[in-house]
Design a protein with these regions (language model features):
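A short glycine-rich, Lys/Arg-flanked "PGG" loop and its adjoining helix->strand segment in the class I
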Residues: 137-149
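Conserved class I S-adenosyl-L-methionine
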Residues: 56-65
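Class I (Rossmann-like) S-adenosyl-L-methionine-dependent methyltransferase catalytic domain
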Residues: 1-52, 66-101, 107-113, 154-246
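Helix-capping/helix-break motifs at membrane-protein junctions
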Residues: 132-133
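Conserved acidic residues
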Residues: 57, 78, 120
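A conserved beta-strand element that flanks and buttresses the S-adenosyl-L-methionine
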Residues: 123
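Short catalytic micro-motifs in class I SAM-dependent methyltransferases
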Residues: 126-127
Length: 246
């Protein structure tokens, strides 16, 4: 397999995106408890700091989710733009970081109004699986336009076709054991089996990528790309790619 494919048959993309945005815009059980949610976002923020090019960098985190520890990234750069498609998420971000001078929150359509070639780094973590290939191509064109020459896109947590449910569960339980919420994680796995996330994943599907297919997609969009040695976040079976604007 050398191309992107959904884990089910092709879906109508507009309802698919509306379904996923609605899920993230509402209360959900994707995190088993507050501890899980906190350490999840802290781990991501700490991983992202390694990609920061320097203290004068302007950075966009697109599809950032609740980004509880975005301040850890903002503290080592000049400017951090947080963007998410879910209005409720954006409102929480605005409230959480209202007093942080380096952080601003924008809707996706506001991101597209940013001046060309003004960003040093774009972060796009754990989002590609919710988009069709065409939708990802459109966003890659936006990111290419916004990045300075030599600027980088970090596309993280990409799900490969060979990624199994067992591998995902194992990664979660290891992360939970290391961070003190193992019992809650075990109970959460039972809830997830009957959750809206499982229902939506069955109905709408996820888009999966082989390593070579993602590199080819990034290079076709105008980037020089390679797979990073480690993935962002807790799941080592997923993939992170680093793409530099040519």
């Amino acid at each position: 397999m050398n191309s992107a494919e959904p884990d089910r048959s092709q879906h109508d993309n507009a309802p698919r995106m509306r379904g996923w945005v609605s899920f993230w815009n509402s209360e959900n059980s994707i995190y088993v408890n507050a501890r899980h949610r906190d350490v999840h976002f802290r781990a991501i923020a700490d991983d992202l700091r390694a990609y920061v090019p320097g203290p004068q960098a302007s950075v966009l985190d697109y599809g950032c989710g609740d980004a509880l520890h975005a301040d850890r990234v903002a503290d080592v750069i000049f400017r951090l733009i947080l963007s998410d498609a879910a209005p409720a998420v954006r409102e929480r971000l605005r409230q959480r970081f209202a007093s942080h001078a380096k952080i601003e929150v924008r809707a996706p359509e506001e991101v597209e109004a940013i001046a060309d070639a003004t960003l040093d780094l774009v972060i796009f973590n754990s989002v590609a699986q919710y988009l069709s290939g065409d939708e990802l191509d459109r966003l890659l064109a936006v990111f290419l336009r916004l990045l300075k020459p030599g600027g980088r896109l970090v596309l993280g947590d990409v799900v490969p076709p060979a990624h199994s449910t067992v591998a995902a569960i194992t990664a979660l339980l290891r992360f939970a054991a290391h961070n003190g919420f193992l019992l809650a994680a075990l109970a959460g796995l039972v809830r997830t089996a009957f959750s809206d996330y499982r229902r939506l994943r069955t109905q709408l599907g996820l888009t999966l990528y082989e390593e070579g297919a993602m590199i080819a997609k990034l290079e076709a969009a105008g980037f020089s790309a390679h797979r990073a040695r480690t993935n962002i976040g807790h799941n080592p079976a997923r993939m992170t790619f680093v793409a530099e604007r040519r």
